[in-house]
Amino acid sequence: MNLMTTITGVVLAGGKARRMGGVDKGLLDLNGKPLWQHVADALMTQLSHVVVNANRHQEIYQAGGLKVIEDSLADYPGPLAGMLSVMQQEAGEWFLFCPCDTPYIPHDLAARLNHQRKDAPVVWVHDGERDHPTIAMVNRAIEPLLLEYLQAGERRVMAFMRLAGGHAVDFSDHKDAFVNVNTPEELARWQEKR
């Protein structure tokens, strides 16, 4: 499979950012560029089509030149709703989802997930210590199951990924690449480090 053309990259920026005081995390500046743009740029080196899932400040995200897709379900039901919304509005078979607050994803993310997925419809990153189910390669085939899961009021990403028949892919050699920004203090530390 030609990864560049058969996988749609998606920056997930649709959350409420409660731990950041409600500030839209994707728009926070890291070394002169918004967090979401770091993720989009990393995805664009691996894939030819990248979109953004955002529920606030869509015009700002659109100014970055990428298509912006809003959740089709109301009340910010979480990252799974963003995944569903993108699958409902994009024609691709495979999707690579990454949260907007993971600006240092590795350059071989798509290739490694694809290589290790075997026949699974869903694979996600495991950094050697913990799962990162929102950094995931997902096949369109799970869309009906995902819709049913969300309509039943479920929101747990990891539980859904397992229900869908997925498995983790080991990225313990890139553990630091998956640290995300959850607080203003963490963002300040990143500004100092990189």
Curated annotation (Swiss-Prot):
Mg(2+) binds at residue 101. SUPFAM superfamilies: Nucleotide-diphospho-sugar transferases. GO terms for cellular component: cytoplasm. GTP binds at residues 12-14, 25, 53, 71, 101. The keyword Nucleotide-binding applies. GO terms for molecular function: GTP binding; metal ion binding; molybdenum cofactor guanylyltransferase activity. Pfam families: NTP_transf_3 (PF12804). It catalyses: Mo-molybdopterin + GTP + H(+) = Mo-molybdopterin guanine dinucleotide + diphosphate. Keywords: Cytoplasm, GTP-binding, Magnesium, Metal-binding, Molybdenum cofactor biosynthesis, Nucleotide-binding, Transferase. One of its GO terms (biological process) is bis(molybdopterin guanine dinucleotide)molybdenum biosynthetic process. Monomer. Transfers a GMP moiety from GTP to Mo-molybdopterin (Mo-MPT) cofactor (Moco or molybdenum cofactor) to form Mo-molybdopterin guanine dinucleotide (Mo-MGD) cofactor. The N-terminal domain determines nucleotide recognition and specific binding, while the C-terminal domain determines the specific binding to the target protein. HAMAP family: MobA (MF_00316). This is Molybdenum cofactor guanylyltransferase.
